[in-house]
Curated annotation (Swiss-Prot):
Coiled coil segments of this chain: none
One of the protein's GO biological processes: biotin biosynthetic process
Recorded name of the encoding gene: bioB
Signal peptide range: none
Domain Radical SAM core span(s) in chain numbering: 55-288
Amino-acid positions noted as binding [2Fe-2S] cluster in the UniProt annotation, renumbered to this chain: C152, C213, K283
Species for this entry: Prosthecochloris aestuarii (strain DSM 271 / SK 413)
Pathway(s) of this molecule: Cofactor biosynthesis; biotin biosynthesis; biotin from 7,8-diaminononanoate: step 2/2
Protein name listed in UniProt: Biotin synthase
Co-factor binding comment: Binds 1 [4Fe-4S] cluster. The cluster is coordinated with 3 cysteines and an exchangeable S-adenosyl-L-methionine.
Protein's UniProt keywords contain Membrane: no
Broad class of enzyme this protein falls into: transferase
EC number(s) from the headed UniProt entry: 2.8.1.6
UniProt family annotation: Belongs to the radical SAM superfamily. Biotin synthase family.
Amino acid sequence: MNGAVIDPLIQEAYGVLETGRSVSYDLATRLATLRGEAVVDLLSLANKVKNRFAAPDGALHSCSILNAKSGACSENCRFCAQSLHNQADVESYSLLDRSKVFEAAGRVYAKGVRHFGIVTSGYGYRTVNKEFQRIIDLITGLREEYPGLKVCASLGVLGSDSAALLADAGIAHYNINLQVSPDRYSDLIADSHSQNDRIETIRLLRKHRIAVCCGAILGVGETMQERIDLIFVLQALDVAVIPLNVLVPVDGTPLEGSLPLAVSDIVKTFALCRLAHPDKVIKFAAGRETVMKDFQGLLMLAGANGFLTGGYLTTRGRDVGDDQAFMEQLKHFSGRS
């Protein structure tokens, strides 16, 4: 009986495990052509890279978010239930008051979650206004109320003054996703603003030494090659956390009839992202329950070392307690159980 043979492409990619340096764009492109059993070997390598460089102590990054301001968004993002341009049935409300935000943070804090994100709908805050100042007060207040809680935010496009205030408030991470490769943003995501607005915000955040959380949405019509393009754009921007969402089609949006991606393509994308970002946090978010279903745990063995827990902006997620138990079981695959 012949012994198992590892594909030469994967053998070449094992250099990441030895050096901690990213695979090249060319090698990532060739790895994307792998099929069948070779994909499992690719996932195995990605998991080893994660364990060695991103989670050597077996630690996983879990975070919870609060939809603190919902709906009535001026932008025309094709996947989003909160856009005024779409016809989705979504609740709209202004910025939540302090008590509701603190209550939400307290619930997940009590269950062991130590990253909590405040998310608002809308284009963003290029200038500082009263609402933005309220958000700053929420961030500082939460940090005082809950010791060790890392408060994050996703507030859209920023200006220099608003970024500076976030830095002064001690924000842990700022999320602003690029979603797809630059040359596909206007036709796949939105044309009411440019992706460059987001890239400029990332540069502002880096200037103010704020760690950036920036990722993608998979399944909006992009190709695998375009996913690789975005993975390397994120590498050039040196973002700290990369959330990968899988499209959950929402009725009343232009993408409501989209077909789900194949699980093999999703896990391959996660693995390639890990090989291009050996030491970063890569977390999976929307779609893990509804699209991945029985295979969601596989993503944590394909290079991911974090996830969003407790629900998303307009859709429900898994219970935080269930996810905490999930994290404990995953430790058995890290060699740190």
